[in-house]
From Swiss-Prot:
Primary location class: cytoplasm
Name recorded for this polypeptide: Large ribosomal subunit protein uL13
Self-association state and partner proteins as the record states: Component of the large ribosomal subunit (LSU). Mature N.crassa ribosomes consist of a small (40S) and a large (60S) subunit. The 40S small subunit contains 1 molecule of ribosomal RNA (18S rRNA) and at least 32 different proteins. The large 60S subunit contains 3 rRNA molecules (26S, 5.8S and 5S rRNA) and at least 42 different proteins.
Xref: InterPro entries: Ribosomal_uL13, Ribosomal_uL13_CS, Ribosomal_uL13_euk/arc, Ribosomal_uL13_sf
GO CC list: cytosolic large ribosomal subunit; ribosome
Keyword line: Cytoplasm, Ribonucleoprotein, Ribosomal protein
SUPFAM superfamilies for this protein: Ribosomal protein L13
Record field: transmembrane: none
Pfam families found in the cross-reference section: Ribosomal_L13
Role, per record: Component of the ribosome, a large ribonucleoprotein complex responsible for the synthesis of proteins in the cell. The small ribosomal subunit (SSU) binds messenger RNAs (mRNAs) and translates the encoded message by selecting cognate aminoacyl-transfer RNA (tRNA) molecules. The large subunit (LSU) contains the ribosomal catalytic site termed the peptidyl transferase center (PTC), which catalyzes the formation of peptide bonds, thereby polymerizing the amino acids delivered by tRNAs into a polypeptide chain.
Location of this chain's protein in the cell: Cytoplasm
One annotated GO molecular function: mRNA binding
Amino acid sequence: MSSFESVVVIDGKGHLLGRLASIVAKQLLNGQKIVVVRCEALNISGEFFRAKLKYHSYLRKMTRYNPTRGGPFHFRAPSRIFYKAVRGMIPHKTARGAAALERLKVFEGVPPPYDKKKKMVVPQALRVLRLQPGRKFCTVGRLSSEVGWKYEDVVSRLEERRKAKGAAYYERKKVAARQLSEAKKSAKVNDKTAEALKEFGY
C-alpha cells in the first residue's frame, strides 16, 4: 500500500484484526481513503474462549453515574469493533485525527458498489503469513454473534447470494471470451482491408 490511490478497498477476510488496524490507521493519517469489507471474517489470534472472556471483561467496564450516556460504549458489530481498533491508533480528538477517521468506511459483507470493485489484501496482516501453522484463531463474526450481534445469518445469506451472482457472471464472461477468440480465428479479411491494416502496422 505504498502507492497512493483515490480509494483502496480491502477484503478483510483472513487478516488479523490488530495488524490490519495498525496499517490502515497509518495510511489514513497519510491521507489515503480506505474501505474495509467483510469485517465479520477478520481473525483474532488465540482460541475463541480466551477472546470471549476478554470481551466480557471489557463489557463490564462502565461509568458509575450514567453508563447509557457517559459510556464507554461497547460495540457488538464486527465493523464497529474494527473501527474502534483503528480509532484507538489515531489521535481522533484532534482535527488531523478526526479528518483521518472520516476517510475510513467499514462494512460487514460486500455491499454495492464495492462488490464490483477490485479488492486488495495486505500481506503484512494476513493470518497465513503472520501466525505460525497450527496456532489457534477465531473470527470476529463469531465473537460478535456470541456477545449480542444479531445479523450474522442476514450477512451470510447476502454473501451467498453475492457469490452465486459473481460465479454466474464469471461463467458468462468465460463464454463470451471463448466466442470472441473463435470469431477472431474464423474471421476472413479481404485484400483491401489487409492492405489498410498493414499500412497502420497491423
